[in-house]
From Swiss-Prot:
Zn(2+) 2 binds at C153, H155, C197, C200. Residues 267-299, 317-458 are annotated as: Disordered. Residues 18-128 form the RWD domain. Zn(2+) 1 binds at C135, C138, C161. It catalyses: S-ubiquitinyl-[E2 ubiquitin-conjugating enzyme]-L-cysteine + [acceptor protein]-L-lysine = [E2 ubiquitin-conjugating enzyme]-L-cysteine + N(6)-ubiquitinyl-[acceptor protein]-L-lysine. Pathway: Protein modification; protein ubiquitination. E3 ubiquitin-protein ligase that plays a key role in the RNF14-RNF25 translation quality control pathway, a pathway that takes place when a ribosome has stalled during translation, and which promotes ubiquitination and degradation of translation factors on stalled ribosomes. Catalyzes ubiquitination of RPS27A in response to ribosome collisions, promoting activation of RNF14. RNF25 catalyzes ubiquitination of other ribosomal proteins on stalled ribosomes, such as RPL0, RPL1, RPL12, RPS13 and RPS17. Also involved in ubiquitination and degradation of stalled ETF1/eRF1. This is E3 ubiquitin-protein ligase RNF25. Residues 377-388, 412-423 have a biased composition (Basic and acidic residues). A zinc finger (RING-type) spans 135-201. Keywords: Cytoplasm, Metal-binding, Transferase, Ubl conjugation, Ubl conjugation pathway, Zinc, Zinc-finger. Its EC number is 2.3.2.27. One of its GO terms (biological process) is rescue of stalled ribosome. The lineage of its organism: Eukaryota, Metazoa, Chordata, Craniata, Vertebrata.
Length: 458
C-alpha cells in the first residue's frame, strides 16, 4: 500500500501530461504526441516548424520537423532533440539550430521547457527565411532581389529557369503521348503525367505565364576554358581509349549487330572440286606403294572414302601349291571392285571355290581400315578368275620379284560363266549349311562380308 501510494504521488508530481495538453491546445493539429506507458517509457513529440509570415505560405521558404524525445525523469533530465526533413537549410545551419536548442534545454533544466524549444525553432527559421544553396537547374546561388519560387515540396528555383524547364518537359510529354497513341491505339488510355519536380519528382503546381514574366537572372555567362591539367587528362584518356580499341576492349555496337548478318545479295563463291581418284583404272602407282608407305596409306584412305561401304572388303592371298600347304609370305590386301548400280538390289553372293588360294574377309575389322604396306617383297595381286581345266594344273603360281610388278589386275565383273561347279555336286543339289557365324547372310544395318573357301576346305 505504501509503494502504490508513492507511485501515485509521483504521477501527480509529473508535469509532462499537463504540459502536453497545453501544447495540443496551442498548436492543434500541428502537434503529434506518441505517449509511452506511463513513466516506464519515454514520450515522443513531433511538430513541423515554419517561419512566422502571418500565415503566408508562399513566403515560407524554409522548414524542418522538430522531434523531442522526453525521458521519464523529465523535467530533471534534458529531452533528446533531433531535426528531420529540413528544407532550404544547409548542413551548417542545421547544426547551428541543433546547438541553439540544446543550450535552451540545458538552461531550463528542472522546469517545463517544451514550449520554449518549439518557439526557439520558429524564431530561428524566421530569421533565416532565405533558401540556402543553388538553383538545381542553373547551379547558381540565389542573390538578393532575384525572382525565385518555391514548390510545394520546398524546393527552390529561379522563375526564369523553372519556366524553361516546364516548357521543355511539356514538349517531351506531348511527343511521348503521340508515340503511345500510335503504339497502343486499342489499349486502355493511361493517366497523363504532368510536369514533375526535377529534385523529388513530385507533381508541380505552377503558373507558366507568371514564371515567364519574371526577369532573367543577371548571372555572367562564363565560357568553359580547360586548364593545363584538364588537357593532360584528356590526352591520357585518348591514349587509353586507342590502346583499348587496338586490343579489342571497345565494343562497337554497330559491328556487333552485323556480326552474324548474312547477305543474300552476293552469291557464295563456287567451291573448288577436289581431285577425284579413278578407282576403276587403278591410278595409284606401285612404285609409290613400295617406296612410300605414308603416301600409300593416304591413297587408300581416299579410295575408301570414294567407294561404297559395302564394297570395301579385303582379299587375302596365300601362295602355294594347294589349299593344304602352309601359308607363305605376308598377307597382301587389295580393295575389291564395287557392285555396279545396274545390277539392281544387292543379293548375297554365292560361295565360289578358287584354285591356288582363298579369299576371306578379315573379321573384326571396320569397313574403312587403313591399308598396310607390305614389309617384304610385294606379291602378285590375286586374280579372282580361276584357271580353265583345259590348260591343266601347272602347280602353284610363281611369285614374281619386286621388279616384275605388273600393276593391279584388270577390273572384272562377276560373270557366272567363268565359274565352275564342284565336281561332286549336281544342279539340283544344295550346299551344306554352314555353322552359325560363318558366311551366313544376316540382314541388318551393316552388311557382313561373305567368306570364300576352297573346295576341299568346305
Amino acid at each position: 500500500m505504501a509503494v502504490s501510494a508513492s507511485v501515485a504521488a509521483g504521477d501527480e508530481d509529473w508535469v509532462l501530461p499537463s504540459e502536453v495538453e497545453v501544447l495540443e491546445s496551442i498548436y492543434l493539429d500541428e502537434l503529434q504526441v506518441v505517449k509511452g506507458n506511463g513513466r516506464s517509457s519515454p514520450w515522443e513529440i513531433y511538430i513541423t516548424l515554419h517561419p512566422a509570415t502571418a500565415e503566408d505560405q508562399d513566403s515560407q521558404y524554409v522548414c524542418f520537423t522538430l522531434v523531442l524525445q522526453v525521458p521519464t525523469q523529465y523535467p530533471h533530465e534534458v529531452p533528446q532533440i533531433s531535426i528531420r526533413n529540413p528544407r532550404g537549410l544547409s548542413d551548417e545551419q542545421i547544426h547551428k539550430i541543433s546547438q541553439a536548442l540544446s543550450h535552451v534545454a540545458e538552461a531550463g533544466l528542472g522546469t517545463a521547457m517544451l514550449y520554449e524549444l518549439i518557439e526557439k525553432g520558429k524564431e530561428i527559421l524566421t530569421d533565416n527565411n532565405i533558401p540556402h544553396g543553388q538553383c538545381v537547374i542553373c547551379l547558381y546561388g540565389f542573390q538578393e532581389k532575384e525572382a525565385f519560387t518555391k514548390t510545394p515540396c520546398y524546393h527552390y528555383f529561379r522563375c526564369h529557369c523553372l519556366a524553361r524547364y516546364i516548357q521543355h518537359m511539356e514538349h517531351e510529354l506531348q511527343a511521348q503521348g503521340r508515340e503511345r497513341e500510335q503504339e497502343r491505339q486499342h489499349a486502355a488510355p493511361e493517366q497523363a503525367v504532368g510536369v514533375q519536380c526535377p529534385v523529388c519528382r513530385e507533381p508541380l503546381v505552377y503558373d507558366l505565364a507568371s514564371l515567364k514574366a519574371a526577369p532573367e537572372p543577371q548571372q555572367p555567362m562564363e565560357l568553359y576554358q580547360p586548364d593545363a591539367e584538364s588537357l593532360r587528362q584528356q590526352e591520357e584518356r585518348k591514349r587509353l581509349y586507342q590502346r583499348q580499341q587496338e586490343r579489342g576492349g571497345i565494343i562497337d555496337l554497330e559491328a556487333e549487330r552485323n556480326r552474324y548478318f548474312i547477305s543474300l545479295q552476293q552469291p557464295p563463291a563456287p567451291l573448288e572440286p577436289e581431285s577425284a581418284i579413278d578407282v576403276s583404272r587403278g591410278s595409284h602407282q606401285p612404285s609409290t606403294l613400295a617406296t612410300k608407305p605414308s603416301t600409300t596409306s593416304a591413297t587408300h584412305t581416299a579410295l575408301s572414302v570414294s567407294l561404297p561401304l559395302a564394297s570395301q572388303y579385303t582379299c587375302e592371298k596365300t601362295p602355294g601349291a594347294g589349299p593344304h600347304l602352309p601359308k607363305l609370305g605376308e598377307t597382301q590386301k587389295a580393295v575389291l571392285d564395287p557392285r555396279r548400280a545396274s545390277r539392281g538390289p544387292w543379293r548375297q553372293p554365292e560361295r565360289r571355290h578358287l584354285k591356288g588360294g582363298e579369299c576371306n574377309t578379315l573379321k573384326g575389322t571396320s569397313d574403312t581400315q587403313k591399308l598396310q604396306s607390305p614389309e617384304g617383297p610385294l606379291k602378285e595381286s590375286m586374280d579372282l578368275k580361276p584357271e580353265s581345266h583345259n590348260q591343266g594344273g601347272k602347280g602353284p603360281p610363281q611369285d614374281k620379284g619386286p621388279g616384275e610388278w605388273q600393276g593391279p589386275p584388270p577390273r572384272r565383273t562377276r560373270d557366272c560363266a567363268h565359274w565352275e561347279r564342284a565336281k561332286n555336286r549336281t544342279p539340283a543339289s544344295s550346299y551344306p549349311r554352314l555353322p552359325r557365324g560363318r558366311g551366313a547372310y544376316r540382314p541388318g544395318p551393316r552388311r557382313e562380308p561373305v567368306s570364300l573357301e576352297s573346295e576341299d576346305g568346305s
